[in-house]
Amino acid sequence: RVSRGLGDVYKRQLYDNKEGRRDVEQLRNLLEGECTNIAIISSTEEDRQKLKDRLDEYNLLEAIYNDDIENQQKLHDVVQADFAFHYEIICMSHNKLYMDIYMMVQQLISSHIRHLIYTRVHRRKAAGLSLGSMDAITEASHEAIYQSIINGDAEAARNAREQILGIVPAHGLDYFEDYVDPKDIHL
């Protein structure tokens, strides 16, 4: 048990740098992209309702966190809700192996999510911008992913996912001017 705990700490440290986060980002993009495509094709009403419930929970906890961005418990809560939303997409594939793999790397994914949320909200604060709902200020939103699944739009899902994951810089989250060269943005 002790060695497992040390292994978890080691893994988090191994991936807690720019290159490591990129590895996690690519794994998430691979799994979440494939599962989103499957969800678009074969999700049930029950699947979609579960995803909507996770979306509503995320939106509520995001709003609570945005009112107190230095509160570590509120950050933890929104990270867990964010993970639950993305895991629900994995579950919509009905592929047990995808679900197991995602859960095996849950701590790494949660660390990636935490980094993105924390960095982006503090970047917005430093720029003097509203800390309101990200869904209201950018197309890189969980709502956009949800709607793309409902509407069967794989391209919209890919665009939103790549911005949420930090693969493509998101206006309103990663940059605030008309254009910033993506090479100048460091997530």
Indicate residue ranges for each PLM-predicted region:
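Conserved amphipathic alpha-helical segments that form helical-bundle/coiled-coil interaction surfaces
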Residues: 24-119, 141-144, 156-170
